[in-house]
């Protein structure tokens, strides 16, 4: 029945959200360290908190869910930043996350495209 499909999808969405939230918190300091390393000429205090949170959650998604392509994740979080943060946040976040992703690939910690 259609209601079973919706219930199953709700459970999958709920499981995804919980796993993403958990990874964002558990590996938050590791993600922030990587983000900080790529923020050339920027002090963390000058960055919008929302931008840091968005980048942290994006990295959690990239590192935790191998079936979601990197460009899909990046596009989603860049759009999120444009909507919930400052007008320039999308470009800023794109640059930082792209740098972090390239570093993770070089370190062989990220094995997807």
Q: Where would I find each of the regions flagged by the language model?
A:
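Alpha-helical oligomerization segments
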Residues: 71-76, 80-113
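Membrane topogenic helices and adjacent juxtamembrane segments
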Residues: 13-35
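Amphipathic alpha-helical elements of HEAT/ARM-like alpha-solenoid repeat scaffolds that form extended
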Residues: 14-21, 51-59, 97
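Residue-level detector of well-ordered alpha-helical segments, enriched
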Residues: 1, 16, 50-54, 73, ...
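Strongly charged, low-complexity linkers/loops
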Residues: 28-76
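Short, small-residue-biased leader/transition segments that mark boundaries at the very start
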Residues: 2-6
């Amino acid at each position: 029945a259609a209601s079973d499909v919706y219930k199953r999808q709700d459970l999958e969405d709920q499981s995804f959200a919980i796993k993403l939230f958990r990874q964002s918190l558990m590996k938050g300091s590791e993600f922030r360290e990587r983000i900080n390393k790529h923020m050339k000429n920027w002090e963390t205090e000058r960055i919008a908190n929302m931008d840091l949170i968005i980048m942290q959650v994006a990295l959690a998604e990239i590192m935790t869910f191998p079936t979601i392509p990197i460009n899909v994740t990046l596009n989603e979080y860049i759009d999120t930043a444009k909507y919930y943060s400052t007008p320039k946040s999308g470009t800023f976040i794109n640059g930082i996350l792209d740098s972090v992703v390239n570093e993770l690939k070089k370190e062989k910690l990220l094995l997807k495209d």
